[in-house]
């Protein structure tokens, strides 16, 4: 999604892609917007300048590095790209949960100061996407209303915000520190709550009818919503304890999950009466299936959890 939107909105950008599977990528990526909040913008296509598994070939000379991979892979990626980072580069990720700032400081070490690097992170991914054909096209489902960004050094956060606003054409709001992101998980509490809520009584063997599987978000039930709420309540309790001990600590982004989702998807939610209904009626959460796999590849009608 990032390649398609950045390339489409900024056609003069040169976009290089570091991938373990470079042969799977086409010369460009198309993002289809039908059914999303961005439908009136039409489809977006971004051109890829270069795709390789060689970090030196991809990263050398880059002014902005955006890491778009799961949290547990970021440390190894940072270590891989470190020798090839350019003086003054911005090095960041599209979502900061998982302690990205600590990973970056550990992996990049003295190079942050010696190369005048800026570390940054968005609080949330700019949009939810669903792959159609890997490396070729995707569906954009849920674009965010605003982006929130933190940086190290902190005094560069306004500059980073301006860069990311230019990249995504979504307003980027400065955030006072990475702890706002570490303690503001989204999928890390939404997915466990949803999966447990739906599968808690499953025997781990009996397959499901593929045609009867609910959608991951828009068919969220009361049990799943309650589990997600319990997890979020723990996050709010941690915030309360931290602020009580450190009164000057600024954690404005750590707000209840229902308020957070309504802010992220402003204008896309038709019923805000409960957490369940927020999920059910959010067009930004629509059309996302459960991660299921067929029991038999020849017969996709029976599925189990991936």
Task: Label the model's feature ranges.
Residues 134-155, 220:
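Short beta-strand and adjoining strand-loop segment in the mid-core
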Residues 154-162:
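Short, conserved charged micro-motifs
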Residues 19, 69, 95, 151:
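Short beta-strand/turn micro-motifs composed of small residues
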Residues 1-40, 59:
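NAD(P)+-binding Rossmann beta1-loop-alpha1 motif at the extreme N-terminus of oxidoreductases
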Residues 71-134:
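Rossmann-like NAD(P)(H) cofactor-binding subdomain of soluble oxidoreductases
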Residues 14-16, 92, 118, 148:
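A structural signal for isolated positions on well-ordered beta-strands in alpha/beta enzyme cores
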Residues 171-306:
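C-terminal substrate-binding/catalytic lobe of Rossmann-fold NAD(P)-dependent dehydrogenases
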Residues 41-92:
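Rossmann-like NAD(P)-binding element
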């Amino acid at each position: 999604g990032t390649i398609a939107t950045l390339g489409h909105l900024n056609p003069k950008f040169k976009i290089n892609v570091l991938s373990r599977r470079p042969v799977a990528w086409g010369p460009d990526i198309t993002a289809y917007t039908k059914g999303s909040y961005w439908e009136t913008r039409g489809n977006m296509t971004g051109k890829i300048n270069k795709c390789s598994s060689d970090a030196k070939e991809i990263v050398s000379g880059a002014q902005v590095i955006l890491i778009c991979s799961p949290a547990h892979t970021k440390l190894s990626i940072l270590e891989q790209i470190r020798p090839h980072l350019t003086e003054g580069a911005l090095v960041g990720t599209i979502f900061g949960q998982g302690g990205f700032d600590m990973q970056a400081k550990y992996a990049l070490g003295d190079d942050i100061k010696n190369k005048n690097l800026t570390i940054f992170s968005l609080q949330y991914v700019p949009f939810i996407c669903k792959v159609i054909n890997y490396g070729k096209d995707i569906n954009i489902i849920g674009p965010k209303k605003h982006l929130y960004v933190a940086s190290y050094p902190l005094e560069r956060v306004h500059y980073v915000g301006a860069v990311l606003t230019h990249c995504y054409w979504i307003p980027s709001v400065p955030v006072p520190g990475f702890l706002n992101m570490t303690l503001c998980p989204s999928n890390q509490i939404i997915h466990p709550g949803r999966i447990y809520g739906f599968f808690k009584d499953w025997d781990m063997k009996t397959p499901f009818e593929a045609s009867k599987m609910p959608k991951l978000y828009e068919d969220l039930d009361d049990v799943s919503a309650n589990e997600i709420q319990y997890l979020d309540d723990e996050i709010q309790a941690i915030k309360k304890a931290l602020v009580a001990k450190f009164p000057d600590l600024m954690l404005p982004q750590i707000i209840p999950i229902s308020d957070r989702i309504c802010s992220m998807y402003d204008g896309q939610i038709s019923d805000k009466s409960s957490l369940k209904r927020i999920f059910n009626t959010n067009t930004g959460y629509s059309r996302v299936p459960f991660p299921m796999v067929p029991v038999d590849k020849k017969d996709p009608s029976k599925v189990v959890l991936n």
